[in-house]
Amino acid sequence: LEILPVIGRLIKEKNGKARAIVSGNQILELKEQDDRPVLMAAFDIGTTTVAGYLLDGKTGEQLATASALNTQTEYGADVIMRANYSLKYGAEELSTCIRKLLRKLIGTLCEAAKKSPEDIYQVSVVGNTCMHHLFLGIVPDSLVHAPYNPAISQGLMFPAEKFHLGIHPGGQLVALPVIAGFVGADTVAC
């Protein structure tokens, strides 16, 4: 809504030449036209490894890739151990841990491509259902007890600033949908 009052003025001042970055039905940015890139990042949060990709948001071209050991391994080597840890202590530590890793990987991706994290307008994340839930800060108790259903299965979109990823302040985070208790968004992405 904060963009709406300036739309008319900006278009008039720039002789109709303005740049709007739109995600779904939301205007993420409106400013005078420039040559700055519109970037996206995608992450596959695996139990062991997190893989990241930096993409040109206009062409879809892959600009850089990076990967790292999932830092949640310090809380348990596998999904069951991490789920049990979160049942006992909550999901906040595990969630913060993986979010910090994504922020670090965003820096690595941008450095490799000689781009700025401020030019990333969307981050998409996938993972098995437990990794999905822990990233979002959801204790996966519904996954460790019958009938082993996810707490949330639909795709979600959030303001990325809530996840402290260090991208454009108006950027979005998209968590792809999961299918079932142990069929996650990583399968949806295939």
Where are these regions (language model features)?
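Gly/Thr-rich phosphate-binding beta-strand-loop-beta motif of the actin/hexokinase/Hsp70
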Residues: 29-72
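N-terminal phosphate-binding loop and adjacent alpha-helix
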Residues: 71-111
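Nucleotide/phosphate-binding catalytic cleft detector across ATP-hydrolyzing
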Residues: 1-42, 47, 96-99, 104-124, ...
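A near-ubiquitous, low-amplitude feature marking generic local secondary-structure context
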Residues: 60, 66, 85, 170-177
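Alpha-helical context
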Residues: 30-31, 44, 70, 74, ...
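Extended active-site and interfacial segments that coordinate phosphate-rich ligands
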Residues: 58-82, 143-150
